[in-house]
Amino acid sequence: MDQHIRIGFVSTRLAGTDGVSLETRKWSHILTDLGHECFYFAGESDWPEARSYVVPEAHFNHPEIRALNADLFDHYARSPQTSQRIQALQLHLKTHLYEFVRSFDLGLLIVENALSIPMNIPLGLALAELIAETHLPTIGHHHDFGWERKRFKVTAASDYQLGAFPPILHSVHHVVINSYGARQLALRTGVSSVLIPNVMDFDTPPPEPDAYSAAVRPALGIAPDDYLLLQPTRVVPRKRIEQAIELARRLNSKCTLLVSHSSGDEGTAYETYLRTLADLLDVRLVFASDVIGYERSQAPDGRKLFTLADIYQQADLVTYPSTVEGFGNAFLEAIYYRRPIVMSTYEIFRRDIEPKGFRVIGFEDFITEETVRQAQAILRDPALAAEMTRHNYELGRRYYSYRILEKSLVVLLNQILGI
């Protein structure tokens, strides 16, 4: 068998700085370095056009998909029209998936979360049917599952969810990013999985701050003497950003809390609540997703667009008070960019990450006086912060580097394809 294969990544969106898109980039980078060729199917893609196959209906934010989800979730019955439209969209997407496989002569699919969480049910059904009909070797890379999300618990789509999220098919090989996901997948479906955690390129240190990244503060109206607290997540309730606002208030120092991402697919009500709370507590809150991209560039209105790296380099402290995380990309990013972090010790962190020895300012259900005291100490003592972040970086290099991902992917491809 040819040792180099053509691989197709499939997701609802492969663009921007969300966790799935970022991890896809890392997998693609490693697989390309190993000599394989990678191609991309999604509702939105910022990969080169020659390697992308874009079908708008594959995006979870497509109007038809949003309309379907409105009838499928928070209800126990769906309309016949919804069922008919799902079937029509499934066929439409399956036709394009067949063409994607044919036109790029693919030998392996890697499905990024589109067989894990039912944000686009027609796409999941189309993928499951394609795989069942072709027996095409497939990796289901599961970042989080539908049963982990509150909004998918009341459903008129349980028949679809059981069939495709995830599908139990002989040629689908399941990869999860945490041990809890592996146990739940086995308990609920009886199938085994491979655990491959998220990673960062710890063997290549982050770039040093430069004049471009120094423009972050003036561009966002943040004073040079303000402490910049970075909340590097989407604006969704499970991120508990209200606790980051509370921390900023209780530090009793000049602070700006910057939120890096948008709300994504979960509406704007939570953002409105956060703005109101910040006003009540007299905390400066900046939502900066409109000036953050994957690469440095310029917006149509002339504003500079910054990378996440630029934002991290200007941050004094990272806040991460989530109740639930599939793994914790923001945690790894904070470690990589050598920033101290105040965070809730969510379940996956306690099970999979904390035992490795990382040093964080941790709390459980609420921010305590001790949490505030430790955060103040870190902000006021650069030497203490430097020692904490140096220690964490070395652990990150040991456990979550690209080398670890490369070894895991080599073994996985050998098991699936014998290469």
Task: List the predicted regions and their residue ranges.
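Aromatic "clamp/platform" in nucleotide-sugar-dependent glycosyltransferases that forms part
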Residues: 323
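Conserved donor-binding/catalytic core segment of Leloir-type glycosyltransferases
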Residues: 9, 217-218, 222-239, 245-248, ...
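A charged, aromatic-enriched C-terminal amphipathic alpha-helix characteristic of glycosyltransferases
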Residues: 380-414
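Donor nucleotide-sugar binding/catalytic pocket of nucleotide-sugar-dependent glycosyltransferases
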Residues: 147, 160-215
